[in-house]
Amino acid sequence: MNFRQFFKLILLFCITVSSCQSTKNELYVLSAPAGNLYTKINRTGTTVLPNGRFLTPAGKSYEVAPHPFGLVLSGDGEIAVTANSGISPLSISIIRNLSSKPEIRQVPPGPSGNAGVLESVFMGLAISPDNKKVYVAAGQDNSILTFDLLTGNKSDSIDCAVSADGERFPDGYIGDMVLSKDGTHLFAVDQMNFRMLIIDTKKMQVIKSVQVGRYPFGIALSHDEKKVYVANVGMFQYSKIGRIEQTSDYKKALSFPAFGYNTEAMRNGIVTDSMVIPGLGDPNSDKAFSVWAISIEDCDNPKVIARIKTGNLVGQMVDGIPAVGGSSPNSLVATTDWLFASNGSNDNISVIDLKTDSIVKDISLKPDESVKHFRGVIPFGLAVSPDEKKLFVAEAGINAIGVIDIPAFKVLGHIPTGWFPSKLKITPDGRNIVVTNAKGYGSGPNGGKDFKEG
């Protein structure tokens, strides 16, 4: 049996919210619920994962290609597209007629993909207002591609290596993106060059780029579309040592760490009698683990107007233990008044006031009081209900969707999903959730010597 067949997209038609039960302060013994049960995939019942956890996803499931880390939903809620990356086939899946009988088209088709159609893809997707085409972030190909939503054919491409003002970035990695409501401007992150791109969709050209923080990962527009927000997940800024790469003299490369973690030498770099080793920067800099606000009232003259640190600082005492890593804000979503950022390493959501661009609260995502000192919820994708009363969080580490009451900033409960929910969207009527599960139902046994791929 081909394990790739079990990577799923879960379409939830019914949302049920259960309140968390409070527990007394007592000793707990925690263990994997599966005990000594073998790994098992059960599409209609309880699946046993290799890590000993159970899967009992709500809603209905539809198969797409492996690792659907990206998701976009059309304005009418009838078309969803997933970006499938990680292992072959690198592809997108176009799901039409979501409200009735979904039809799924993989582009390019087949188990091996097609390098001539889609050589690279990562997360970023946007559907044009007329539902005719989808923009696809082509990752390390340093471009954005467009595909016809009806035929699945590739129609055009945007070269992100050069912009209208003459800037050149020959090496880039295009990720998350968001499209303006009128479809005239596309905003995308270049993870490799630490920048945010502004693209004119009529000219199919990058018109401006803005330097942002370390490793930009998530992006969102404010409701009035006067600002775009970028979430930076990176801690350090790595630099090349001298001219080793240009001269291919790799014998001069270091085979050992140049400095200790979080030392002055690490932050600022060191100089020896033979080489200069650049520093990695301050892990608590506003360039690291942060959300940046960029004014786009004039797309020809974008300006960074705020740098917001989210979650816990490196070294900050949390539950009596100093934090080693940062917050890793990875995804963003905005309402009229608030911007929400999911802090993947802190298991919480930062609430940012859009008027002041400052944090007003962090919402903890602990499924139970007995495990409050542990980390591992891994909040990822975010979505808001049309009435802006509920926030939905893809909790990748516990295979669930967290439901938060926005007026009260309170967790209401958790909805079971497939393995490692990544991105999610709410249909326009507010009745359904569409969520991609990056690991689907997990993997079963190997196919054996007679297995045929496909």
Regions found by a protein language model. Give the residues of each.
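Blade/loop signatures of beta-propeller domains
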Residues: 25-57
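Surface-exposed loop and turn segments in beta-propeller and other repeat-based domains
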Residues: 48, 60, 105-117, 156-169, ...
